[in-house]
Amino acid sequence: MRVHRFCVIVIFLTELLCFFYSSESQTTSRCHPHDLEALRDFIAHLEPKPDGWINSSSSTDCCNWTGITCNSNNTGRVIRLELGNKKLSGKLSESLGKLDEIRVLNLSRNFIKDSIPLSIFNLKNLQTLDLSSNDLSGGIPTSINLPALQSFDLSSNKFNGSLPSHICHNSTQIRVVKLAVNYFAGNFTSGFGKCVLLEHLCLGMNDLTGNIPEDLFHLKRLNLLGIQENRLSGSLSREIRNLSSLVRLDVSWNLFSGEIPDVFDELPQLKFFLGQTNGFIGGIPKSLANSPSLNLLNLRNNSLSGRLMLNCTAMIALNSLDLGTNRFNGRLPENLPDCKRLKNVNLARNTFHGQVPESFKNFESLSYFSLSNSSLANISSALGILQHCKNLTTLVLTLNFHGEALPDDSSLHFEKLKVLVVANCRLTGSMPRWLSSSNELQLLDLSWNRLTGAIPSWIGDFKALFYLDLSNNSFTGEIPKSLTKLESLTSRNISVNEPSPDFPFFMKRNESARALQYNQIFGFPPTIELGHNNLSGPIWEEFGNLKKLHVFDLKWNALSGSIPSSLSGMTSLEALDLSNNRLSGSIPVSLQQLSFLSKFSVAYNNLSGVIPSGGQFQTFPNSSFESNHLCGEHRFPCSEGTESALIKRSRRSRGGDIGMAIGIAFGSVFLLTLLSLIVLRARRRSGEVDPEIEESESMNRKELGEIGSKLVVLFQSNDKELSYDDLLDSTNSFDQANIIGCGGFGMVYKATLPDGKKVAIKKLSGDCGQIEREFEAEVETLSRAQHPNLVLLRGFCFYKNDRLLIYSYMENGSLDYWLHERNDGPALLKWKTRLRIAQGAAKGLLYLHEGCDPHILHRDIKSSNILLDENFNSHLADFGLARLMSPYETHVSTDLVGTLGYIPPEYGQASVATYKGDVYSFGVVLLELLTDKRPVDMCKPKGCRDLISWVVKMKHESRASEVFDPLIYSKENDKEMFRVLEIACLCLSENPKQRPTTQQLVSWLDDV
């Protein structure tokens, strides 16, 4: 009985399932043959085929294909085609125009090239067209017939020609127009005013000229207008008041001039007004200064003037105020604290005077405050008032309070202060005790003042302090031993408050860098700067415990005793300057273990003995050791004549160099013979062989010396003959004023040759041995390494103690300069320019890896080794320092080089440099381009000091979009930026085998 019932149930359920299956199959839409044919032709032009697409001639069920939606009335017409972010490459087919029932066409975030087929602009039912973030080019046709269109997004492509404002003639229902990040040029034409329903108009980062057309001001529903980074000019029209729904107005980085119109009381919903870097004059309009809706006001870098008057009682929503670099004068507005939500204030570089108002005691919301270069007075009053700002974390007061006394008032207390900069004020007094109560202090800069007395021991009690600059004062006594115990420099537990990303943070320039090329800004590396004081006593052995310290500068003091060998424990150290002291003994050999040390000086001390020759010491110039009793192989030979070979200059002068002359005498035969061989090879390559030199491969020292005094070997046949004297004249005898940076193994000078050409001359340090072999490697290899994305070696010269390399001059300096040092650099580097820089540099690297014979490993890929010409084309520099490889080798086992933050993890495990190591370093550069952040930067929140770790963390939290530089990131170009981020992360794989080849890297970047 039970079996019978079970069978009946099974039969019933089977019949029921068959019924539903039959019913469903009868109602399922099958793709209309007309649309099927169009889709097959469309996909035939693209690769790879999307998942689930069936490219078989027998299949007719395209309504089930990925990204396809058909209507529900059994006609099988395609109404949605959505294949965004599918890595599709190829071109679009005219057959798309046959999908005459389509409502949504979304092919964004792919790699589609060429122009848009004309047929697409005649789809009468199309409501959404999104082709953003592709590689599409050409102009937009004058005839557009899209009457149902509501959203039109062609941003982040390569479209050119006139702005397609005529789209509104037949598309009156359109609500969103996004054309940003393209190459549209010419006058900002009228036409958009016919789109009466328009809400978003994004035209930023093109090349538009003229002014905002009048018909645009008829758009009552417009809430976002982005026209930033064009070349628009003239005054901002008063008719902007008609845009009553406006929420965000961005006119920054244009050429607007005149006064800002006083019409903001008619823009009741405006939250964000960005007008920085224009030519606005006058004051803040009264209506803008009374806006209750405004959240952010950025008018930095204009010519605004007069008294600053804001009605903060009315500005109840204001959060960020940036009016830096203008001409405001008078006193600081007393009512700023009435802006109850105002957190970030930048008023630096104006002409304010007087004192910080007493009312600032009530500025409870204030977090970031910069008043640098504002001619303020009464620092005692200012600090006494600002201490009441309970949320204040960053205070920058540089270039104020000239000659006043730094108060030592025990009642002062800054509870949450993390960054304090009161530099270059010529303050008198001593280190105030009240600073010790700021327990969260992380960065303290009191440099370039006139402070005296001892540096107190409590300075080492700060748990988070990682940057201390007390240089250029008059401190006396010993260095407090407590500094050797700074917790932030012995552990990774560091957290720094990061200012608002739209605000310029205080930056300390590298004063030794005098021009664009190779310039670097020290982005707050962990630092102890105590130079140019009157400190005495020893350098404590315990300083070796500061494993996280990057810069240790004690120059120009009266320190005595020996250099502790324990300093080798400062394993992150990049710069060590102990020059101009009274140190004795020898240079510890253990310092050779400092792998990242790139700047070192012990000049003008009383040191003796042998200069270490291993590690980074082979790269330091003789000037690092001068005015001591030191000797060393390849420098000042240690021999029977050691006494005469020592440098015996007066402590503070640089007279004749007897030891150098003897050293040159011992090495001249080798140097001049090497010169003859290199000259002979170079002339043979150029087809200009001197018969006398060819006959005699050995010349006496006098003859070669005479040739060397005149000869500059040039590799370009059209270059005019040069002599060493010409190079001296072109650099004013290598005057420091012509230094444009420090490249590999020496200084780089800007030179203008007799024919008017600009070049960069690298003057190599060192005399022979390893240094000469590196020089010969550069000369022999770079003369054959010719590629548009490499810095061209134009020639070289041997003369006496000088070895000179002559390079092409790069007008725009280094990528590092534009990203990290020049204040407006990141904003001027648009995304398309950054992408082109990455693509070019990758091509240069591919040539080094595969195009050269022998192949070359760069081994020091970084943003400061990517130079930019006048058109911002990228050129790899300093690759001559790489070890050479035969075409059949896959790695070299030599002493490793590199720069902290760019070095692959595997380099710490074995002395093996590989192509994949260069790819890793290139991935770090890609992150710099995307984020505008340094690889290692202490001024980041906890866990964000290391750029790679921070990016990985943000990706895992699905917050990848937050890593992008806000100056270039927008929905218009996010597809390209996400793709480059993906490429960067692949380059940064911990397993070298999982990283792309250089060829793949180039191909992927070209397809972005």
Swiss-Prot record:
Repeat recorded as keyword: yes
Outcome reported for the amino acid change (mutating S598Y): Decreased responsiveness to PSK for interaction with BAK1 and decreased root length
Effect of F596D: Decreased responsiveness to PSK for interaction with BAK1 and decreased root length
PTM-bearing positions, type Phosphotyrosine: Y807, Y847, Y902
Transmembrane segments: 660-680
Lineage: superkingdom: Eukaryota
Catalytic reaction list: L-seryl-[protein] + ATP = O-phospho-L-seryl-[protein] + ADP + H(+); L-threonyl-[protein] + ATP = O-phospho-L-threonyl-[protein] + ADP + H(+); GTP = 3',5'-cyclic GMP + diphosphate
Alphabetical list of Gene3D superfamilies matching this protein: Phosphorylase Kinase, domain 1, Ribonuclease Inhibitor, Transferase(Phosphotransferase) domain 1
Residues carrying Phosphothreonine: T731
PANTHER family for the chain: LEUCINE-RICH REPEAT-CONTAINING PROTEIN DDB_G0281931-RELATED, OS08G0276400 PROTEIN
Designated name of the protein: Phytosulfokine receptor 1
Higher taxonomy: Eukaryota, Viridiplantae, Streptophyta, Embryophyta, Tracheophyta
Gene: PSKR1
